[in-house]
A protein has these predicted regions:
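A nucleotide- and high-energy phosphate-metabolite-utilizing enzyme signature
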Residues: 1-20, 24-26, 31-307
């Protein structure tokens, strides 16, 4: 476990996080699937009665040590029992059990903190939505933050056809075929709302603060939203991968992309070490000088000026 932790916080931790995504997909379709289907008195050889779309750090293959796992549950139009109302209840029951099993705290900890608030309609909507309901919602939505969230969308469970149908629905919502200059204004509004909330904090936040992780992600996502509809090379979920494509497409200078990549990797390393130390989701640099020194030493900085 220690060896895995040390390996994870090297400069390669973001590039190699595909294993984390695969592990979640295996767990979701493995033991958790069996429990969910058993509770529904269904054949264990069947798939889950819905597909799972990952967003956020899981969708982008960028998990850290204490990431929330943002998911959306979507089902196709295939019937389970022949009764639509009963099918809906079965799907909701399976979804609740899946969340409970994956979030359950045991002696070994828990698999994931699952966050379902990014689903269409948020907490006001059912846990599982049909593909048609999801498409109708996004067709009517004008919220930039939802387009940004779906940049990271990646199927992690469900039938291959459902996954394909979901992504075919998501892509046109995120990536517009015509250049939309309103993107700049809308992204700026989202950023300002985050900054207003962050200004209430007294401590330095490496995620939401000026020059932090979120600012780099917003910079990259703005290019994706502007040009991704006409340049499919930008339709990627990982921040580092998109930076490489921004170089290849000459949308930003190579040196600028390299500086952003270096800053992003450094801030993510700090994030990992903060969460290893605090054992919870933390993005705040400690105010204590002693704790700051301890954090710096854990990052490999040995010769620290004591003044």
């Amino acid at each position: 476990c220690l060896r895995e932790s040390l390996s994870f916080v090297t400069s390669h931790e973001l590039v190699n996080s595909e294993k984390s995504k695969n592990k979640l997909a295996e767990d979701t379709t493995g033991g958790q699937k069996r429990e969910s289907l058993s509770s529904m008195h269904l054949n264990q050889n069947q798939n889950l009665p819905f597909g799972i779309l990952a967003l956020g750090k899981l969708g982008g293959n960028e998990l850290n040590f204490s990431s929330d796992v943002d998911l959306i549950f979507i089902h196709d139009n295939e019937t389970i029992t022949g009764n639509l109302e009963f099918d809906h209840k079965l799907r909701i029951k399976a979804a609740r059990l899946l969340i409970e099993v994956m979030s359950e705290v045991t002696e070994e900890g828990f698999l994931a903190r699952m966050d379902m608030r990014l689903r269409p309609g948020g907490e006001r909507s059912p846990l599982v939505l049909s593909l048609d309901e999801t498409e109708f919602y996004y067709t009517a939505s004008r919220e930039m933050w939802e387009r940004q969230a779906l940049i990271k969308a990646s199927p992690v469970a469900g039938s291959g056809q459902l996954s394909k149908d979901v992504m075919n629905m998501v892509k046109p919502f995120v990536y517009r075929s015509l250049l939309d200059e309103e993107v700049l204004h809308d992204v700026q509004k989202v950023k300002e709302r985050i900054e207003e909330e962050h200004l209430r904090e007294d401590h330095l936040n490496i995620k939401l603060g000026v020059g932090g992780i979120r600012e780099i992600e917003f910079f990259v996502q703005t290019f994706q939203l502007l040009y991704g509809g006409v340049n499919k090379q930008l339709q990627l979920t990982g921040t580092l991968q998109v930076l490489q494509q921004l170089i290849k497409t000459r949308l930003i200078p190579k040196r600028d992309a390299e500086l952003l990549q270096e800053a992003y990797l450094f801030l993510r390393r700090v994030e990992h070490h903060l969460q290893l130390r605090d054992e919870h989701q933390s993005h705040t640099i400690p105010s204590s000088i002693e704790q700051q020194y301890a954090l710096a030493r854990s990052l490999g900085y040995k010769n620290l000026d004591s003044e």
